[in-house]
Amino acid sequence: YGVGPVQGGLYTFTAAAPVAAGLSLFGGGESNASHTAYESGMSAWCGNCHGAFHNNNTQLIHKSGTALGGAYSQIYNLYNGTDDPTGGVQATSYLAAVPFEDAANTTTSTAGPAASSQVSCISCHRAHATSAPDAGRWDFAVTLLAEDGLESGSYVIPDPYASVNQRSLCNKCHNKD
């Protein structure tokens, strides 16, 4: 898959397929030490069907396909949950629930992002299906992850920090706890 006509010529993709390494179907569930390794191109790939959804709409404020930069990568790396918002370390800060793109990613990477790593559509959303509204990796409308699924009626998405106090995973990059 890549650039060119798809679905028998009904659509034309202008962005090539992303570079990523996936897990074996028989390897168990995703974890912080065993996960899809997103390397590059996810936002452009999503844009084949969804356009530059967040980049060209004034009602949506989250960029994608751009470098995190030093400030956001530092917040990501330090954030270790609501109960420990600055106790993380870069070497073990990867959170499978909030992935990022980096050419150095592997399926067993545990390191958090560098300033040059990219935020992508898949940092907050899953492709085409989740139990959360808006194909979110979590329910964006709740304050506490313990409320996930209650308001929307969706399947409760597990809290990666296992804390009754854990706030939205937006805090992994935007720490407002």
Regions found by a protein language model. Give the residues of each.
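A motif-centric signal for short, conserved binding hotspots located
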Residues: Y1-D177
